[in-house]
């Protein structure tokens, strides 16, 4: 039998034909991993078609051997769509969808049918979320907006009770806990990557991080993506696919429900399907109490970024996590008179000062003189303090040790031992519980030179809300936000526990500026970028903007137009990176 294969060669897009001799042809199927010889080298390749008609007059070489069971046929087909949608290599997606270890090929029977749960999900558990369980699993995409304090496990259990369910989470720890909880409920479930072989056999629910979007799950009955707004679901290396996008397409092709769960759904999710949320009282009760400290009127006698409300919390004896995210930040300037943050008049992002003394926007590159747009003064001061300096200030103020926690590590052996911890946003991802979370300089998030800055800021507040007790608890926790922009929509949404209010305004703003998801965007960079964008067909609705920092932006009204244009353009030799749906612009 003649098969068509995709060689595992970086940058190679050509598919080749090989013959599978007897008796192996009885075992071969789409997705299987085989060894081939190509140009004197032995390479691995994935079978993407079986029983093809080879071109006339061409000698077909045999495959060397059947190497391993690979992605299920429907997943192998999905990678063809993924290569088009994310303008990348199909072989890279096939590698992502493959087992981390070799699985010996053998005759495959029908997938076992999942038995009914020995301990079904309680309707009261789903009802406690303020949702109607009967409406959750309608065909298509459902965006489930639940507050930070709500446990999403009942949704997962309800889905798994219907049959094998694919569950995608941002973090491995959450995935492991969910897989164990499904098992304790009498539902068959495996975690990735260790459970890939069992998942390939079928009949069980599959739980994993973003790579689970390409994992086997047969027969698939539902797809659930938890915290769909989390950037950990996006693959940074090319092709830069997003697990949420893959999950939506996979569910569509399989004809099963897709649930996107989040306390603050992304605009991409909101545009993909209907929104289900609890009543306002229930949703608000699941958000924390958010105290906003207006830093425009900071006490000059206190050290920088230490306000009177923060000092009161620190001296209360409570467990406090202080967040100051300096990694990769732009320089911030504030008026020495009124204290207003220096921001771009065009897009609202923070501005820095170039060598000539002018103020330059880090997002849109607009240039303006050194003048406060609020009071007209020409004297600006730097607003910058690092985590280490803040730790020293806090230790002096409260008279006890303070731990420092960043993505690179902690200042001590155990970052959870001290009562007060200060760190970057890594702290709220590595610590499970606190009485209070304080964002010392939230302006960094609100005015960052990124088009998603507001959305990302709200996501941080939601994450902090999971560390502290909600406002409905007998002893509610608090989230303290120090900012010079207290009326920012993201802050107001967290204070009121109403993320829908933020989403409405954010959608309008991005549509006016031509940013995703209102427009489809790709970034093109590296040495071959100039040649590639020159070959794009821009006679229609395709826009090519740039270069800025040696990157070009390609923009179109929709993904069908954008991805079609990217696929049709010739690929020049040399390094080329195409990032579709970039998280940062």
Q: Which functions belong to the PLM regions below?
A:
Residues 1-288, 315, 436-439, 447, ...:
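Accessory, non-ATPase domains that flank or precede helicase/AAA+ motor cores in DNA-metabolism machines
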Residues 230-241, 296-299, 379-383, 445-455:
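Flexible beta-alpha connector loops of hexameric P-loop NTPases
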Residues 13, 25-28, 44, 72-76, ...:
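Amphipathic alpha-helical transducer elements in NTP-driven molecular machines
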Residues 9, 102, 106-113, 122-124, ...:
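Accessory helical-bundle/CTD segments and flexible terminal tails appended to RecA-like ATPase motors
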Residues 196-217, 406, 413-430:
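Conserved two-lobed SF2 helicase motor
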Residues 246-268, 456-493:
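Conserved segment of the helicase C-terminal RecA-like domain
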